[in-house]
Amino acid sequence: MASFTPEVIGYLGFFPITNTLLDTLFVDTLLVGGTFAVTKNLSLVPQKAQNAVEALLETFYDLTTSVAQNRAAKIFPYFMTFFLFILLANWSGLLPGVGTIGFFYHHGEEKEFTPLLRAATSDINTTLALAIISAIATHILSIQITGIKDYISRYLSLNPLNLFIGILEIISEITKVISLSFRLFGNIFAGEILLVTISGIFAFLFPLPFMLLEVIVGVVQALVFGMLTMAFMAIMTTPHHHKEGVEDPRTK
């Protein structure tokens, strides 16, 4: 049965190396390697593979533009980075050997199995880190685009009503981090438990429909995380005291 917490494979000094950390490094390697492979032989007259990648990126960029409008160019890289990393991290748990190749160790009289790799997003530490990075990037982008004065005015004001709203905004930012992290973790961890249970009871073809379901869940959860981050960034990069019908030059 999958453990709620990641298993420790070894230590680097006093720093524990978990199987989800190894999977994170594996996914990072795939992303970096894939980026080099895709961009290595770009041409003005694109071939089939380049055409497919460009069409996919254009679709996502149009989606970002529909949400963030003239801030799309700044928000799009964050959206795609989160989407691709989370997608590969979700799918990595379905690869042969992930969760099944490892070693046994004795815990008292019992023998327990520790997998060498485990889907990174099935670890609450990973999803919480992603949510915190998303929140920090959102606030940095907000300051860059709207300015520090406008940013502070969202949370601090001499007006008692606006000050109360600002406090609610701060609470809202905390709940965003919690909801982003637990939504992703809960769905992927539940899928991991489901696959382990089904595979333990049945063999061969019966688990395949559930694996297909997890492929779809992996896409949906990556898209949800990326789009929520995109929406939060679009909201935070809109000037707080934006006048209707007047475009703030700082958002260009």
Residue locations for each model-derived region?
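Selective transmembrane helix interface/packing segments
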Residues: 1-252
